[in-house]
Amino acid sequence: MSGLRISLDDLESDSDDSAQMTHQVLRLGEITVSAEGLTTSMGYKYGLSPDDVVVSATGFLGQGSSGSVRRATHRKTGEALALKEIKITSQAHLQEIRRELETLHREGNNSPYLVGFYGAFCHEGSVFIAMECMDGSLASVRKPVPTEVLASIARSILRGLWDLHRNRHLIHRDLKPSNILFSLDGRIKISDFGVSSFLECTRANAHSFVGTLTYMSPERLKGESYSFAADIWSFGLVVAELALGRCPFTEKLARANSSTEAGFWVLLQHLSSDGPVIVLPPTMDSALADFISACIQKDSQSRPTCEELLQHPFITNAMKDDDKHVIKEWLLLMAMQAELIPSSAERETPLMTQSGATASLNLDDELSKLVR
């Protein structure tokens, strides 16, 4: 394993005693992370160390809000992991690590709609977080997504958000397609909690400015206080992007010439105007259009909650089949249309390896090629 070769004692600290660095040990509130793994103040321990994982040399999975993610394997069990490395170069990184670890520890193994958590450890100036390895993100799927499939995806995301909002009092603050993961068996899970924020009650508000600009709500762009409705805005834009096949603000942001500051002012000016947030095509399913419009109301108080959205006709009128089944069948159809796997008639003839030996069809491998 590789990492930034620095001593944690060399880093600057601030007055926040909840995040302390001593040699290769991090004390983050109720959580302590060392080379031997993660422990909590309540005595819970995740026994995971650098020697327990084998990192794939070619398994780069993506870039999160605060670090890179690679595919790895647990040495003893052979289980696939997504290993996120966060190089510690500032006190701000420690706060991100604390937020993510606290959320993963408390929620990652308690909800089927949040990515699972296996442990964390320190190594050579970095913190490594081991999570459930999914097969791709919504940023990588072919778009536009069919309406009935989109309803199943949206329902799964809403159930994850509902768990964060109602049961955990957490605002995700960085909901976007790349932070919503899927597995080839049709599961949808929310990930990347490095900028999430805890609210003591459901009527509280947050104030800090973090997250991805494109999916940020008007109240957040304006520097106003915000609450769970900010996530609903981001969710609405994610659904719109999957339905339209592109980010709704792509053309407007193109004028910013890749400048974050210019993009900020372009979006702020657009969302402060009297015009519509986005113009949906008249051919769009009416229930879907109404669903998206409800999520992206400029007035945060006018946006529905997750619970209310789960009762919207776009969701309730969708196919009653199991959401996992609907999503899995869609992934299979995409693969077949891309001719990455043979049709049912062709499957009667065994596939051949380069050496001429008979091989079985590995559907998961073929689907993985499609979405990467």
Which residues does each predicted region cover?
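Activation segment signature within eukaryotic-like protein kinase domains
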Residues: 153-154
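Conserved catalytic-loop aspartate of Hanks-type protein kinases
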Residues: 231
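Conserved N-lobe beta3->alphaC-helix segment of eukaryotic protein kinase catalytic domains
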Residues: 85-109
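Conserved short submotifs of the Hanks-type protein kinase catalytic core
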Residues: 124-137
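Activation-segment/catalytic-loop signature of the eukaryotic protein kinase fold
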Residues: 120
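Protein kinase glycine-rich loop
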Residues: 58-64, 69
